[in-house]
Amino acid sequence: MINPFQTLDKQLDQIQSWGFEFADVTDNTDGACLGAEFGFTAVASLDANPFDIRRMFESRGITITSICAHANLLDPAAPWRYGTSQIIKAVRMAAAIGVKHVITTEGDPQTGFGQSLSTEEALFTIREKLYEPLRLAGDLGVKILLEPHGHITDSVDNMEKLLNSFNSDALGVNLDTGNLWLGGGDPVEFVKRLGNKIEHVHWKDMPEEFISKRGTMFGCGMATIPLGTGVVDIKGTFEALQKAGFAGHTTLEIAGEEAVLKSRDYLKSLGA
């Protein structure tokens, strides 16, 4: 999402005008969305004809690189919570239109149940809710990528435990530099430990005022500053990814035209 209160086609027009050729399907839900029908939100429906969505991107010369399916994996399953069912729909959509990656994460628990889980209970809950999506992804040739965006996945130790416990070829990692740093992690160390699992990157830098929140806040949707101007070691992370042999797509999760374009230039200056 680039601008609030703007439909998906208008968002794509904007990034096309900036010269971008790749993008994610980010905000989505199953069923219908009033905001999308009446023209003030960029939500895509997981129940839509997936080829209509692909055509919307392709008509602007843009290739879909992933479908985001960020979920609530720690609270109890319920019809109103984005979880296993929606991830499965995202996997089916991706497979239908030739998109390799579906990106998900556990999110912040909102209920007393989710907030009271021990680390081991949380790891088990995530495993249980991703079991069927991973089976389907494996059968359909799609990979589910876990993103640091919660108190479990922001820990490289816990992320490694999850990856090992699934033992699935359909599971990989989407590195989010801003989320990981904000949750208390070190993106450079993360790449050194799990670089061979990383298949997509969300780039975000964070301003100094977030230092006091580090380790207590898990995930932020969009950065508001250009890459290379904040406190995250973007250059070191880029170099670590190069050493790890990373050759996948990356996404600028950054708000504002000036910040987006400066970030693109910064990555190019590093050799992207």
Regions found by a protein language model. Give the residues of each.
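Histidine-acidic metal/acid-base catalytic patches
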Residues: 1-24, 58-60, 98, 153-272
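Active-site acidic/histidine proton-transfer and metal-coordination neighborhood
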Residues: 9-11, 16, 51-59, 73-172, ...
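Short, well-structured secondary-structure segments
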Residues: 21-27, 63-68, 100-104
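Glycine-rich, proline-tolerant flexible connector loops at the mouths of alpha/beta enzymes
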Residues: 24-52, 106-117
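Flexible loop residues that form catalytic
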Residues: 28, 72, 107, 206, ...
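Short secondary-structure transition/capping segments
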Residues: 34-38, 77-79, 114-117, 157-159, ...
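A short acidic, glycine-rich active-site loop
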Residues: 38-51, 121-123, 221-231
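Short glycine-centered, acidic/aromatic-flanked micro-motifs in structured strand/loop junctions
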Residues: 69-71, 146-148, 177, 252-254
